[in-house]
Amino acid sequence: MGEVEQAGGSIAGQVAVVIGAAGGIGRAVAARLGAAGCRLALVDLEGAALQAAARELGLEGALALPADITRAEEVAGAARAVAEAWGGADILVNAAGINTRERTLEDLSAEQWEQVIGVNLTGVFHCTRAFLPLMRRRGGGAIVTVVSTAAGLVSPGAGTHYCAAKRALLSLTESINLEQGKHGIRACALSPGEVDTPLVDRRPEPPSAERRAAMLRPADVAEAVYFVVSRPPRVTISDLVIWPSAQISGKYVV
């Protein structure tokens, strides 16, 4: 049998910025990257929730940086704090996301549209734009944006505004790779199917206990994030889709 080359590498000591780290997928990502030895900067809207997450996860030394990611100046302030603490950044995970109970064009208000687009799309732009210079200081880095299978398969259950924002993130990720690859930046659009997070509680019809039990867990998504960011610099995973087995088999339709 020939020699098998190990494709992964250690990310211990790398600076990882996790957006939306106070709960759900972002919290699970923070836990996974912390376990891998990363130095963590945790960003979310509420400072108290960030502090609680860092404490409960045992993430000693993590920076808790409250910021409204729809406001460019607040995100820029978080980036300055990371630069002052560690000089640069190696990993950015865009994991913040929201939705509203109203999902259809008929039911959505203009304010709800702007709110969801603001966090799920414009917020990712602000975070990526603010932290790119810190990654280029390091000679490169990895950006993972948590998208959704709703980006490719428009779902009335996910909502018009949500699907529109998520599909736009696919194009944003492609643009990052096209424009920033020459600087060693690698971007991935990670699209999970249904994930058991508090976000599903906002559906017009909350899922049954059976359906919820079949969903992905935040830790499943976090493990996929770790896989992407731990590849060597020669490897770019531009698009990764992970499904709950029950959903892709057609048992449950969003």
Predicted features along the sequence, with ranges:
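C-terminal helical subdomain
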Residues: 182, 189-190, 209-251
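Active-site helix of classical SDR
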Residues: 128, 165-166
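Substrate-binding pocket helix/loop in short-chain dehydrogenase/reductase
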Residues: 103-105, 112-114
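A short, exposed helix-loop element centered on a Lys and neighboring polar residues
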Residues: 128-129, 174
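Active-site-adjacent segment of SDR/Rossmann-fold oxidoreductases
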Residues: 153-154, 175-185
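Canonical Rossmann dinucleotide-binding motif of NAD(H)/NADP(H)-dependent dehydrogenases/reductases
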Residues: 8-40
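Residue(s) in the substrate-gating loop at a strand-loop-helix junction
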Residues: 148-149
